[in-house]
Amino acid sequence: MCTFSMTIKTFLLCLCLTACNGNEEVTEAETSSGYPSLLNKTVPVPAEYLGETASQGSVVQIDYDTRNYVDGNGEMRSNTAYVYLPYGYKESSDECYDVFYFVHGHGETAASFFQNENGMMRNLLDHLIEKGDMSPVIVVSTSYVYGTPVDYYPDADPYCKALPQELVNDLIPLVESRYRTYTQQT
């Protein structure tokens, strides 16, 4: 395993989506709410980033064993995550990568992150990496949904609260053991 290292460049993905301008004035409405409205301070994704690149990363599905952390009974279950691997990723290489973990919104699935909008997120990652706007990175999309996804999850709170346990105990160790990531050796 590689030794632990952080790179701030991978944070550009998040900044690309919010892109605030420090020179803009904050309105009274924004001040009274306690935080600025980022909706008015985002930038559109450049049109050329919506198409595929010559250097495409890949998205792979991984199924993994986990526990039912909602009920706390330790019952085994399985879950699915999707992993974006940047163009040029090789298992046999010594190169290591930072990892981002994303969770879908309400009514979505782990697959939604990479499938919605004709794969726009994968295309965006490919373009950012190809143009040198961010370092190559592994992106993992997981789900708090147990079983078959439905459009309406009436009581998602227990599942959302249980997700960190699943990430820390099951998914992150699997990703770190299967892919070339920066990890801290213990």
Spans of features found by a protein language model:
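Sec-dependent signal peptide recognition
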Residues: F4-L13
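Bacterial signal peptide processing site
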Residues: N21-N23
